[in-house]
Amino acid sequence: MSKVVVLNDKLEKAGELDLPSKYAEVNPHNLYLYVKSYLASLRANTAHTKGRSDVSGGGKKPWRQKGRGGARAGSTRTNVWVGGAVAFGPTNERNYFQKVNKKQKRLALERALADKAAKGVLFTADSLAIESGKTKDANAVIKKLGVKDALIVKDLLDEKTLLAYRNLANCYVVDVTEVNAYLVSVFNAVIMEKSVLESITKEG
């Protein structure tokens, strides 16, 4: 059974919660498909090369077909010539979008959470707000839990908490609308507010 570590107000371990057993039964291929789709959506699609129809010049045959003793050539803009076209090169017309439906997104998130819970690095607390807005207080949270890096998921993201975590290279803070299977997967630990966890498990 996948367990969620429950933290008290002092961010000390106070107990455990069970994730729905079906989370661990989700086919990991759903997680793979979502991560693949997510990373594809980040591609800028700026690489572009010119094909035979794009390069200028080359309309005239450079030399006669026979009698010179050399290889025949019909244009100076084929891909074997300097200044010629590129064969099978990337173009900015390519669309990298990969469709993933809502059900697969939900299943991917469930599997990602189950994996973290199985490793004992899925935490939940009533509140994760940093009222001081200071980075040292945010860093103290991570040190206290003894994790390398963490994804912080709040129900409503306030400005002070965002400022507190923003300067930490090993942390990323989002609200419940932004959490996804990719973010859960790439961080060593995930810390959620209880309301967020309840919202996610209720949807599942």
Curated annotation (Swiss-Prot):
Domain of life: Bacteria
Entry's Gene Ontology BP terms: translation
Name listed for the protein in its UniProt record: Large ribosomal subunit protein uL4
Family of the protein in this entry: Belongs to the universal ribosomal protein uL4 family.
Gene giving rise to this polypeptide: rplD
Pfam families the record matches: Ribosomal_L4 (PF00573)
GO annotation, cellular component aspect: ribonucleoprotein complex; ribosome
Disordered: annotated segments: 49-75
InterPro entries xrefs: Ribosomal_uL4 (IPR002136), Ribosomal_uL4-like (IPR013005), Ribosomal_uL4_dom_sf (IPR023574)
